[in-house]
Structures are given as structure tokens and as C-alpha cells.
Amino acid sequence: MFKALIGAAVVVLLAVLSKTRNYYIAGLVPLFPTFALIAHYIVGKGRSLDDLKTTIVFGMWSIIPYFVYLAALYLLVERFRLETSLALAALAWLVAASVLVGLWVRLHA
């Protein structure tokens, strides 16, 4: 229930920010590391320090799929409807994330 309330609060915050003079800040709010904090706490409490550091480094590399998503969306919004652009950009993220995981597994196995 608490997570749902936080999620709802974030949605309201995004809606409010999108109507302000500084609407672009709405793009920063989803990047608050809520899930990263949870993941790092769980890994940090349940695994070794080396495992935590590996998780942190992988998190650094995970910025690449997000960049691919943003770049794709930037290019697509002028060519397609917003919904189509969002779906295609999400697909681009999925492909980039799959490549990242595949390379990570291959290089760190």
C-alpha cells in the first residue's frame, strides 16, 4: 500500500511539474534512485562487498539502455504519434538492455 501511495505521489508530482515553466524537470524525477536504493540495500545486506560493487558497476552501465530509449524517443516523436514513439523507444530500450545483459554475462562469466 505504501509503495502505491509513493507511486501515486510521483505521478502527481510529474503532472504538476509538466505544467510549470520548468516542465523539463519532470524528466529528472523518474531518475531518483528509489529502486536502486532498495536493490543496493538488499544486495549489500545479503551478499559480499564485492557482489555489491559488481551490482553498482552494472548499474553504471545500465545508463546506456536509458540513453538509447531517450535518443530513440527524441528521433521518433517527429515521425510518429506519441504512443507509437513511446512503444518503439521502449522496444529500443529492451534491445539495448538485452545486449547489455548478454555482453555482461559473456564478459563476467
UniProtKB/Swiss-Prot annotation:
Among its keywords, does the record have Iron? no
- List this protein's GO terms for biological process: alginic acid biosynthetic process
Q: What happens when the gene is disrupted?
A: Mutants are pleiotropically defective in alginate biosynthesis from various carbon sources.
Q: How does it sit in the membrane?
A: Multi-pass membrane protein
Keywords attached to this Swiss-Prot or TrEMBL record, sorted alphabetically, are: Alginate biosynthesis, Cell inner membrane, Cell membrane, Membrane, Transmembrane, Transmembrane helix
Q: Which family does it belong to?
A: To E.coli YdgC.
> Under what name is this protein listed?
Membrane protein GlpM
Species of provenance: Pseudomonas aeruginosa (strain ATCC 15692 / DSM 22644 / CIP 104116 / JCM 14847 / LMG 12228 / 1C / PRS 101 / PAO1)
